[in-house]
């Protein structure tokens, strides 16, 4: 199975196009988030790119964003834009497994700076993306998650510790995907 997309599908639109469409009321953050979630629902059983995918939480954020756009008061340039964020970037209240079954799952006390900036800008945090144990394996192999798969060839992995984010980006799980890189974590999936 290979992923084939039309660039006119809502889940595949770039962030700047979404913001322009929200501003003109041609699209709403809710309908875009619903389209992204439907696309993720179709592909996630094959790709294993996400951790903590919570559709209702994402839709709640999208509804709040929609109200801000209707009032002409978006929080920032990313308001309503669906985004994934790598699981090693703490989000308040969520466990941070670091890709390994060896850590105790305890909720993060606060957002890490990248997550905080995304929330301040109104971004819709759709899901966390998977990573290998401690972000240390270029293969993407994890003792906590199933191996993330390349949407263009499901027999392969994107590789790198941002393998989940790389798979999510290539599959069109929305326009923005936040990862981290020290030794190739973003560059390998790219």
Where would I find each of the regions flagged by the language model?
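An N-terminal boundary/leader segment
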Residues: 1-59
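Immediate post-signal peptide segment of exported/extracytoplasmic ligand-binding proteins
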Residues: 65-81
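Long amphipathic alpha-helix in the N-terminal Rossmann-like dinucleotide-binding domain
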Residues: 56-63, 122-123, 132
């Amino acid at each position: 199975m290979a992923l084939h997309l039309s660039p006119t599908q809502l889940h595949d639109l770039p962030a700047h196009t979404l913001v322009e469409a929200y501003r003109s009321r041609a699209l709403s953050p809710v309908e875009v988030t619903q389209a992204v979630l439907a696309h993720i629902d179709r592909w996630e059983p094959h790709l294993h790119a996400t951790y903590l995918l919570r559709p209702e939480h994402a839709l709640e954020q999208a509804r709040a964003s929609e109200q801000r756009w209707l009032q002409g008061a978006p929080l920032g340039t990313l308001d309503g834009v669906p985004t994934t964020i790598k699981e090693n970037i703490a989000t308040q209240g969520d466990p941070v497994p670091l890709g390994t079954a060896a850590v105790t799952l305890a909720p993060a006390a606060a957002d890490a700076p990248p997550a905080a900036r995304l929330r301040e800008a109104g971004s819709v945090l759709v899901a966390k993306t998977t990573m290998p144990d401690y972000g240390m394996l270029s293969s993407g192999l994890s003792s906590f998650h199933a191996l993330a798969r390349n949407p263009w060839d499901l027999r392969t992995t994107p590789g790198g510790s941002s393998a989940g984010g790389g798979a999510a980006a290539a599959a069109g799980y929305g326009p923005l995907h936040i990862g981290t890189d020290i030794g190739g974590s973003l560059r390998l999936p790219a």
